[in-house]
Amino acid sequence: MSDLIAAVATPPGTGGVGILRLSGPGAAQAAARVFRPKGTRALPDAPDRQLLYGTLLDQAGQALDTGLAFVSRAPHSYTGEETAELQCHGSPMVLSLVLDALFAAGARQARAGEFTQRAFLHGKLDRTQAEAVIDLIEAETPAAARQAAGQLTGALSRRIDAIYSGLTDVMAHFCAVLDYPDEDLDPFQTQQLQEALQAQEEALTALLRTSRRGRLLSQGLTCVLLGRPNAGKSSLLNALAGYERAIVTPIPGTTRDTVEATVTLEGYLFRLVDTAGLRDSDDPIEQLGVARSRQALDQADLILLVCDGTQEMGEEDTALLDQALDQADTLLVMNKSDLPGYGCPMFRAEDTAHTLSVVGLSAKTGLGLEFLEEELVRRAQALLPQAGQRASELLLTNQRQTDAVRRAAESVARAGQALEQGVTPDALLTDVEQAMAALGELTGRTVREDITSRIFQRFCVGK
């Protein structure tokens, strides 16, 4: 991190304002090469974070635009390094020319997420907070934004640190027993240690229970459209999405792969997945599509079983219904209400033991679509009560966090069982160490380059 990096921090395209960011040794001097203040004070001499008005220059020193600039010095900047920021009009050409001038002044192009990665490496934020930055940038609903904001303040980190501290106390006891065998130390203190381990296991288990809610808030509800070929699944996807996302033809089997679209209804995010009709086929391409459809079903939070309301419910529909009910919460959608012969589904008592909600509509005309949307919102409210109303809510929001907490909980449970069985302190120590290492991966106490790189690969350039 001894080099100077620079990047455009605003999104590509024309805009009212464009921002360039620098971080690293000599950031103020490099920025001064491309910025001429209106007053007599040079940019490197300006007080910390004081905005100066002036002219932005190209490599040849020719004026390009007027704008603002400021310097933020270490260790009080976002990255923990000396940083500078230049603000001008959002012309892609002007931004490109100024960036070229910064490269000529000794900076290099920043990699995606490198500014936030430097903040992490300088201890300005931990891994969970770094993930919250990109979660906040990518948030598609108010609930997701509030959740990311809460994690950015370090709420989850503090909970993890408290558990880590409790395990440290247990570790300290066993280390003392092993390091000072001549001292009069009770190697087990079974009651106190068992209570300490149980408290941390309960805290970890409580966190694990938040993982589904966190995923639903940050990624949305996965809503899979299932049904026979030509039941109108693709038409329904397009109707819900509000645009032609999937190809629609009268030919059964048109959809050969899963097609996805996202839609927000009353603040809830739904990830709609249109599937290939589940049927036996000799076509190898269609077989791949069916396999992906089955994979989508395994990940479903809600299934919309789409049926042709102009036809009687047959064995194939009943088989799909049984399959859907075994996988997830299911809603029956009777499509094609605009066509002659449309009727309500009839089930014999033995067909299903479940109480089903049925919505009738026409995906083609949109008639009745609002009733389906209302039902989707009700299902989301049941899964996510009071979604995102508290920014301080502690939730695990991704698979990395969930896996780390699960490994920690399993290690603590093993340590508790070993303590009951009276195993040697060094064996207990191994389980506690593994739990602490897993928690360390969450916050960054345990630095693994593969984990760090994976997190920051999600970022855009300039952040």
Over which residues does each language-model region extend?
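Switch I (G2) and immediately adjacent beta-strands of P-loop GTPase domains
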Residues: L52-R73, G253-S281, L297-L302
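Short glycine-/small-residue-rich Rossmann-like dinucleotide-binding loops
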Residues: A241, A276-G277, D301, D308, ...
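Generic enzyme active-site microenvironment
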Residues: L272, V306, V333
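Short alpha-helix of the ABC ATPase nucleotide-binding domain corresponding to the H-loop/switch region
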Residues: L278, E286-V290, T318
